[in-house]
């Protein structure tokens, strides 16, 4: 496997897990040829039970897409896929989670190329591919473990169906959001923004990014369309969290 250059940093997010009922939906409203539109390909792993699929979009995906569109002014198109090996049966529970995301990064690029070859969608490096899994990548829901993983500023991520915030957290990393800019907010009760870590189950999910991360995301996404190379991850966010 080729080693990524030092400009790519592995960010592994370990979140406290309490499993909820989940599910599936699909949106396809923006015009694919609109240059301001990004696509998220959400691939359900084969281990996700059918009973969980009816609410995945509304509970996990939509909170992120609403916030992203508010931040960037750009539309997100969500395409849900499933029952498609070798993508939907990808072996994500490995001893080395960094190797896991490296393999998924390669495989997800192949997935986009395959869709382009089959005239299903045009290939774009900017589009994101996220594998949604039923189980943690490592550890257990009882004792804790790795709930999701993403390379900062790259178009692939994996998120488990534990905390509803995990999917938005990992996608946030792919758009250059960082832990250090995560916040706790208060509006009658305390809540955590998408990037705040470590998670405390007593606090609610804000389903928003902090103002600092909003600016990071906006700048980064604008750079994707302007052809600029904006990628700066502070040292403290390179660390693998246990």
Region spans (language model):
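The catalytic-center signature of Zn2+-dependent metalloproteases
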Residues: 147-242
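Propeptide-to-catalytic entry region of secreted or membrane-anchored zinc metalloproteases
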Residues: 23-121, 225-241
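Short, polar loop/linker segments at the starts of domains and inter-domain junctions
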Residues: 51-59, 146-147, 206-209
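Bacterial N-terminal signal peptides that target proteins for export
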Residues: 1-8
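Bacterial N-terminal signal peptides
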Residues: 9-18
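Active-site-proximal segment of zinc-dependent metalloprotease catalytic domains
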Residues: 28-31, 110-185
